[in-house]
Amino acid sequence: MAKGVVFNGLGRVRKFFGKNPEIIDIPDLIEVQKASYDHFLMMNIAPDERPNEGLQAAFKSVFPITAFSGAAMLEFVSYEFDPPKFDVDDCLWRDLTYAVPLKITLRLIVFDVDEFTGAKSIKDIKEQSIYMGDLPLMTKDGTFVIKGTQRIVVSQLHRSPGIHFDHDKGRASLSGKL
């Protein structure tokens, strides 16, 4: 017979049949991946207050893009997310991807370059928001819904085999591999 019955927040009943009570609570093993993905997207941080990390750093590493002639330059200003079109249950039922539309704001600076001196002066500045595509969102369970199917990301640890020494018999040399 069960010694203790616990109702957790997920609606599941956990029964204990052991003699010793649990000493440590079960850790949330998915929390690391959820926090990492939230830190990558930085959806809850205002665009002008985002640190140069995650998706912000990815865009900053590509921009600014300068024309070969030096007559134009494209700068990254910010990115933003629109709300998702469907919730998780609708995406599972309709075979859709649970995602949010990603829009970035870019600034195009056109220069007027003097042919003789090579001096640049700003001719025109245009700023526009551009739809980049839909970015999959992680659910509260730590999964992604892609075309109506739940997918997970499994972290792997790649260990190097260490140092391996080899000795050729009859020679005075040794070789080593890392």
Curated annotation (Swiss-Prot):
What sections of the sequence does the record tag as coiled-coil? none
Q: Point out the gene that encodes the protein.
A: rpoB
Gene Ontology cellular-component terms for this entry are: DNA-directed RNA polymerase complex
- Which GO terms fall under molecular function for this chain's record? DNA binding; DNA-directed RNA polymerase activity
EC number(s)?
2.7.7.6
Q: Outline what the protein does.
A: DNA-dependent RNA polymerase catalyzes the transcription of DNA into RNA using the four ribonucleoside triphosphates as substrates.
InterPro entries per the record? RNA_pol_bsu_protrusion
Q: What is an annotated GO biological process for this record, any one?
A: DNA-templated transcription
Q: What is this protein called?
A: DNA-directed RNA polymerase subunit beta
Q: Which family does it belong to?
A: Belongs to the RNA polymerase beta chain family.
Keyword field: DNA-directed RNA polymerase, Nucleotidyltransferase, Transcription, Transferase
Q: Which reaction does it catalyse?
A: RNA(n) + a ribonucleoside 5'-triphosphate = RNA(n+1) + diphosphate
Q: Which residues cross the membrane?
A: none
State the organism of origin. Answer: Liberibacter asiaticus (Citrus greening disease)
What's one Pfam family here? RNA_pol_Rpb2_1
On assembly, the entry states:
The RNAP catalytic core consists of 2 alpha, 1 beta, 1 beta' and 1 omega subunit. When a sigma factor is associated with the core the holoenzyme is formed, which can initiate transcription.
Classification via SUPFAM superfamilies: beta and beta-prime subunits of DNA dependent RNA-polymerase
